[in-house]
């Protein structure tokens, strides 16, 4: 990072209390901004929480599930494997597609649907690369690329397996 960027980012260390959302962020702050910290400043980790009411599967109704599956062009006759996260190389979408191909070799093709759910945020070249990879493995009928979902709790509920395939440490 440039010196200007480091100085700009150091503004956060001027507070009396600095809260990091993960051990990764805590270590990053200590490593990169230690010269801005002193013994009077307190640095601590408070992990992000989740709203358990929002993710309560009993609050979702079957008609909403059917609408979502129709929107995704999925019949619920097969299992659904979901990879949520914006489209970026370190989120592991390429690894996921390659893994789907390997699972297909073991289970037979089209035994399940795979949903890659997340915005490309203008990275259309990366999305095209993922689509080409899925075509190369002949997975076009099986993999769904979904740009956005307003109801992630519902997306999790209709899915049988949720995958995190990140290839680098997450900030949270």
Q: What residues fall within each predicted segment?
A:
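A short, active-site helix/loop in glycosyltransferases that binds the activated sugar's phosphate group
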Residues: 15-45, 50-55
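Short hydrophobic "strand-cap" motifs at the C-terminus of beta-strands
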Residues: 21, 46-49, 83-87, 117-118, ...
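Glycosyltransferase donor-sugar binding loop
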Residues: 50, 84, 113-129
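A conserved mid-protein helix/loop that constitutes part of the nucleotide-sugar donor-binding site
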Residues: 79-105, 128, 170
């Amino acid at each position: 990072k440039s010196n200007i960027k480091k100085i700009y980012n150091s503004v956060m260390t001027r507070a009396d209390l600095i809260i990091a959302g993960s051990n990764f962020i805590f270590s990053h702050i200590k490593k990169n901004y230690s010269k801005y910290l002193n013994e009077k400043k307190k640095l601590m980790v408070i992990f992000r929480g989740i709203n358990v009411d929002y993710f309560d599967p009993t609050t979702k109704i079957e008609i909403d599930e059917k609408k979502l599956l129709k929107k995704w062009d999925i019949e619920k006759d097969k299992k659904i494997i979901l990879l949520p996260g914006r489209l970026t190389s370190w989120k592991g979408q390429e690894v996921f597609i390659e893994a789907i191909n390997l699972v297909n070799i073991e289970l037979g093709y089209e035994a399940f649907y795979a949903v890659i759910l997340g915005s490309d945020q203008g990275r259309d070249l990366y999305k095209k690369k993922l689509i080409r990879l899925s075509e190369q493995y002949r997975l076009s009928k099986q993999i769904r690329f979904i740009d956005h979902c307003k109801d992630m709790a519902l997306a999790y509920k209709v899915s049988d397996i949720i995958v995190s395939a990140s290839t680098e440490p997450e900030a949270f």
